[in-house]
C-alpha cells in the first residue's frame, strides 16, 4: 500500500499535466482548483480524525 503523500503527489502531478492541455483553464483557475483539492483533503482528514477519537472514547 502506497503512502498518502505518494498518492497526493501523484494526483497533483496528474492535474498539472492535464491542466495545460485545456485551453479554457487559466493560471488562476488551476491555482483555485489545486487549493480546493488540498482544502478538501484536509477537511476529510480532520473529520476522520474526529470520528476516530470519538470511536476510541478520547473525546
From Swiss-Prot:
InterPro entries linked to this entry: DUF4730
Alphabetically ordered keywords of this record: Endoplasmic reticulum, Immunity, Innate immunity, Membrane, Mitochondrion, Signal, Transmembrane, Transmembrane helix
Coiled-coil stretches noted in the UniProt entry, renumbered to this chain: none
Residue ranges that the UniProt entry lists as topological domain Extracellular: 25-29
Signals that turn on the gene: Down-regulated following vesicular stomatitis virus (VSV) infection which releases SMIM30-mediated inhibition of the interaction between RIGI and MAVS and leads to the activation of type I interferon signaling and innate immune responses.
Stored Pfam families: DUF4730
Cytoplasmic-side positions: 51-59
A single GO cellular-component term on record: endoplasmic reticulum membrane
Physiological role: Negatively regulates antiviral innate immune responses. Disrupts the interaction of antiviral protein MAVS with innate immune receptor RIGI and inhibits MAVS aggregation, resulting in the repression of type I interferon signaling and innate immune responses.
Name recorded for this polypeptide: Small integral membrane protein 30
Amino acid at each position: 500500500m502506497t503512502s498518502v503523500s505518494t498518492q497526493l503527489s501523484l494526483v497533483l502531478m496528474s492535474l498539472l499535466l492535464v491542466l495545460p492541455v485545456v485551453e479554457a483553464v487559466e493560471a488562476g483557475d488551476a491555482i483555485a482548483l489545486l487549493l480546493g483539492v488540498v482544502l478538501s483533503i484536509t477537511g476529510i482528514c480532520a473529520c476522520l480524525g474526529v470520528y476516530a477519537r470519538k470511536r476510541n472514547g478520547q473525546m
